[in-house]
Amino acid sequence: MTRDTSPDLHYLSGFGNEFASEALPGALPVGQNSPQRAPYGLYAELLSGTAFTMARSELRRTWLYRIRPSALHPRFERLARQPLTAPLGAINPNRLRWSPQPIPAEPTDFIEGWLPMVANAPAQKPAGVSIYIYCANRSMERVFFNADGELLLVPEQGRLRIATELGVMEVGPLEIAVIPRGMKFRVELLDGQARGYIAENHGAPLRIPELGPIGSNGLANPRDFLTPVAHYEEAEGPVQLVQKFLGEHWACELQHSPLDVVAWHGSNVPYKYDLRRFNTIGTVSFDHPDPSIFTVLTSPTSVHGLANMDFVIFPPRWMVAENTFRPPWFHRNLMNEFMGLISGAYDAKAEGFLPGGASLHGVMSAHGPDAETCEKAIAADLAPHKIDNTMAFMFETSQVLRPSQQALECPQLQADYDSCWATLPSTFNPNRR
């Protein structure tokens, strides 16, 4: 068990484990999952995150022992106030970049504050990803679950206290949280307002990547992933339960808190990870390695090595390559890249890419360092130096990402993004090598 920075919160360490936790001693049945009478008069309930017959290495499921079963709810009704889920915008092959979205003036809780940015599949498909930016200034009083996919939260501003069915975790900038599909949760704002990024993964659950020749250690180490311990609410009284189903919000009113799980065991769990613990791998000789070495989490497809979605970070690191153009190289890619910035500056963009902002480089969109960065890199003294006080990230996917209509029409879309490459000169001289 691991104690986090908050003195009242504890976590279980590891990734993909068969965890077990109980808030009351003896609340977990011994030797079976569904006894005739569960301890303390609890109900046994199974939450499946994958099909029953998946390989054991792929299986995600958790047994919950709760005060009331989830089946105890009235009919869901479609809410009058729906999330901003506009249709995908017109086809647009251009490189796009957005300035940071403003925090709303009117009271907005976490689930009201999603701005859809890009997507590549409707929610009913068992693959693809939808990407949002969230902006909120009010803690949730209701409880939410997402039937459409697994949620990866990347805070950029403001700490979040996330009360889930399995326990409570806190995350802030430079940390991430993952919440399984269908798991109920409530988000409280610890700093009054919050902004960040969301990847809604419609495909296979996220996992840490294989290390291959790197060996048995490196990148995101399993022990640094933290899952909350069991914690339950026994509150009586009206609570709104909201679900996101095929992009729409539907709600019902309960007379109790649905976060009433007293004990649980399994592998389908929420977790958090501190990005500062990422063991960065890089060259110690020459050239800039492929950015796949910065992968924190991946959602695979049935094609070996082809990701439904990768979550990649560009953390502080030493640059020591000799006789090398050290920024990320110019590139045209089969994959689609949505980038965000949590803090500092990105080493391939001297200006215009700000914390809370975003960019999209679609399939085969030419991209790379801007003119100012390129000029400095070519002339740089190649002494070892550290890129510090920065954290950029990328959601990368093998399916084409299309921006939403809101993302194409919002005032934060930078009309002059292409100009950052406009002054790249031709330095070719056939008479001088």
From Swiss-Prot:
Q: Which residues form the active site?
A: 288 (proton acceptor)
What EC identifiers does the entry list?
1.13.11.5
Question: What InterPro entries does this protein map onto?
Answer: HgmA_C (IPR046451), HgmA_N (IPR046452), Homogentis_dOase (IPR005708), Homogentis_dOase_bac (IPR022950), RmlC-like_jellyroll (IPR014710), RmlC_Cupin_sf (IPR011051)
Reaction catalysed?
homogentisate + O2 = 4-maleylacetoacetate + H(+)
Which cofactors does this protein require?
Answer: Fe cation
Superkingdom: Bacteria
A GO MF label: iron ion binding
Q: Where are the transmembrane segments?
A: none
- Which GO terms fall under biological process for this protein? L-phenylalanine catabolic process; tyrosine catabolic process
Main EC class of this protein? oxidoreductase
Leader sequence residues: none
Q: Give the pathway listed in the UniProt entry for this protein.
A: Amino-acid degradation; L-phenylalanine degradation; acetoacetate and fumarate from L-phenylalanine: step 4/6
* NCBIfam families according to UniProt: hmgA
Q: What is the annotated role of this protein in its UniProt record? A: Involved in the catabolism of homogentisate (2,5-dihydroxyphenylacetate or 2,5-OH-PhAc), a central intermediate in the degradation of phenylalanine and tyrosine. Catalyzes the oxidative ring cleavage of the aromatic ring of 2,5-dihydroxyphenylacetate to yield maleylacetoacetate.
| Protein name as annotated | Homogentisate 1,2-dioxygenase
> Which organism does this record belong to?
Pseudomonas putida
